[in-house]
Amino acid sequence: MALHDMEDFTFDGTKRLSVNYVKGILQPTDTCDIWDKIWNFQAKPDDLLISTYPKAGTTWTQEIVELIQNEGDVEKSKRAPTHQRFPFLEMKIPSLGSGLEQAHAMPSPRILKTHLPFHLLPPSLLEKNCKIIYVARNPKDNMVSYYHFQRMNKALPAPGTWEEYFETFLAGKVCWGSWHEHVKGWWEAKDKHRILYLFYEDMKKNPKHEIQKLAEFIGKKLDDKVLDKIVHYTSFDVMKQNPMANYSSIPAEIMDHSISPFMRKGAVGDWKKHFTVAQNERFDEDYKKKMTDTRLTFHFQF
């Protein structure tokens, strides 16, 4: 779809945005069309960036980080929906606008969001020595969550059947590319830059400990009472009911929650309800090959 067609694009509940490649990574066409602007994004030293592979706990981490910065003031986080509070750097969606424009209009300090692999990160974020939080999730649960997200999100390609999507994901032919390369790229970068690398499974198992770790990285000293408050307000059940965090304000023509809610399970080990024995064996074999060159390890269940 050409750029002039995209400008006239309107969601009607059936159409989906087209995709293309940027430096070998699949992206929505609108992102490809403004790639030079994204690459040349000018960061500020006090910008805080939250980076994840899609469906690895991004929204959860955003809410936690903002509550840490606001020292547990829940009302401040209710001022606007998630997508308005945290500019999504590389995203441009008809009717919702551009993350770049949002970021430019936002006063400092800004909390920014990206799903970009490390090698495609706008250089100024590293040049300005910005603090970056990366969250990684085990690939089996990540795949399941991404599959259901693509079912309901018309801004991304239709995923096809679960069997088809399983193959697409393994091949890395999804938006934002290969999960394996994404988590490894950020892992390799973490000791060279101001990057705090967290795991979704650790956040589920011991949220208070991980929130404390985040607070220390951000530079906030929070007492136990505030930490407990943040744990409560960022729990899955509370966030699922929070209209400022559950994406229910996005028009149904773009995100159809009747197909699958944005916040579906938020669990560790849900993949076991989707993977067949044969798929699991195939996945494990593929995982072993692709992860031999890293010490990065994941928990697939508790």
Swiss-Prot record:
Record function comment: Sulfotransferase that utilizes 3'-phospho-5'-adenylyl sulfate (PAPS) as sulfonate donor to catalyze the sulfate conjugation of phenolic compounds. Can also sulfonate estrogenic compounds, however, the dietary flavonoids (phytoestrogen) and environmental estrogens, like bisphenol A are better substrates than 17beta-estradiol (E2). Mediates the sulfation of doxorubicin and its analog epirubicin, two antitumor anthracyclines.
pH curve summary: Optimum pH is 7.4.
Protein name listed in UniProt: Sulfotransferase 1C4
Domain of life (superkingdom): Eukaryota
InterPro entries documented for this protein: P-loop_NTPase, Sulfotransferase_dom
Binding residues annotated for 3'-phosphoadenylyl sulfate, in chain numbering: 55-60, 137, 145, 200, 234-239, 262-266
Family affiliation: Belongs to the sulfotransferase 1 family.
Subcellular location: Cytoplasm, Cytosol
One BP term from GO: sulfation
PANTHER family in the record: SULFOTRANSFERASE SULT (PTHR11783)
GO MF terms, alphabetically ordered: aryl sulfotransferase activity; sulfotransferase activity
Active site: H115 (proton acceptor)
Chief location category: cytoplasm
Pfam family, one: Sulfotransfer_1
GO CC, alphabetical: cytoplasm; cytosol
